[in-house]
Amino acid sequence: MEHQTTPKQKTKEKSKGNKTKFVGVRQRPSGKWVAEIKDTTQKIRMWLGTFETAEEAARAYDEAACLLRGSNTRTNFANHFPNNSQLSLKIRNLLHQKQSMKQQQQQQHKPVSSLTDCNINYISTATSLTTTTTTTTTTAIPLNNVYRPDSSVIGQPETEGLQLPYSWPLVSGFNHQIPLAQAGGETHGHLNDHYSTDQHLGLAEIERQISASLYAMNGANSYYDNMNAEYAIFDPTDPIWDLPSLSQLFCPT
């Protein structure tokens, strides 16, 4: 009695014949063998090609595994493979593309951080400029051969005495450091004295000179303030520097 095989048994026998002991190798329905390698660490899945025999496909897998994972990886054969084969060049190009894509992704995140750094630098620079502007004072510096005197030299007249801050000459014989209270007291005292007419006239002349000096000084202060507010520059060619002395104004010859 002959043993007859059913179609299911034939399919099982065929599938058992298709199974191989090689890693990364499988057979197509057409009968050819294909090799494929996966690397979850580097996120690579590479099609190695179609081969006539299972041994050729297994050797292609071994070569790709050694290039991707190193020589200690699991292989189908213990043989060493050349590094200049067409498959090795293909795998190296794939690795280079993966590294380039990774670098591009990292560079895409850099502009955001650089813009943030620029904004921080701009804010800190603006703050430092504001602080520098608020602490800046007027000083006497030469610029383009034009001397700009320090505005701090110009001050208000003292109340205790008539010590003028300017070097303008006054009338000869005039004591410009006489206190106002003393001058006023002497004035009232001499007004009550009918026998000191000459002294009264002398004090009146002194008071007139004091009034003229104060008027000239106040006018100069107003002029300096206007110059500081509008131009902040003292020009040596300005007519203010050519003013005649008070002795020439009040005692013309």
Swiss-Prot record:
This is Ethylene-responsive transcription factor RAP2-11. It comes from the Eukaryota. Keywords: Activator, DNA-binding, Ethylene signaling pathway, Nucleus, Transcription, Transcription regulation. Probably acts as a transcriptional activator. Binds to the GCC-box pathogenesis-related promoter element. May be involved in the regulation of gene expression by stress factors and by components of stress signal transduction pathways. Residues 21-78 bind DNA. Coiled coil: none annotated. It holds the Pfam family AP2. It is found in: Nucleus. One of its GO terms (cellular component) is nucleus. GO terms for biological process: cellular response to potassium ion; ethylene-activated signaling pathway; post-embryonic root development; response to ethylene; response to reactive oxygen species. GO terms for molecular function: DNA-binding transcription factor activity; sequence-specific DNA binding. It comes from Arabidopsis thaliana. InterPro entries: AP2/ERF_dom, AP2/ERF_dom_sf, AP2/ERF_ERF_subfamily, DNA-bd_dom_sf. The gene is RAP2-11. The keyword Transcription applies. The keyword Lipid biosynthesis does not apply. Belongs to the AP2/ERF transcription factor family. ERF subfamily.
